[in-house]
UniProtKB/Swiss-Prot annotation:
Protein name: Large ribosomal subunit protein bL32
Pfam families: Ribosomal_L32p
Keywords: Ribonucleoprotein, Ribosomal protein
Similarity annotation: Belongs to the bacterial ribosomal protein bL32 family.
Residue numbers spanned by region Disordered: 1-21
GO biological process, one term: translation
GO MF, one example: structural constituent of ribosome
One GO CC annotation: large ribosomal subunit
The organism of origin for this protein: Alkaliphilus metalliredigens (strain QYMF)
Keyword Membrane: no
Compositional bias segments (type: Basic residues): 1-15
Length: 59
């Protein structure tokens, strides 16, 4: 059975655990119609356009 030869330090242990919990911000793109930021592959919440067409009526 595999056994560690040396004790893993708290720093090494914490760095290993922290690498799995990095915060990744979503990539934003600019809407080609109103130039506001929006999430990709979604209808623009400001103007209601998607893929060059008005999908929902914006107020």
């Amino acid at each position: 059975m595999a056994v560690p030869k040396r004790k893993t330090s708290k720093s090494k242990r914490d760095m290993r655990r922290a690498s799995n919990s990095k915060f990744v911000a979503p990539g934003y793109v600019k809407c080609p119609q109103c130039h506001e930021t929006k999430l990709p592959h979604r209808v623009c919440p400001d103007c209601g356009h998607y893929n060059g067409k008005e999908v929902i009526a914006a107020e």
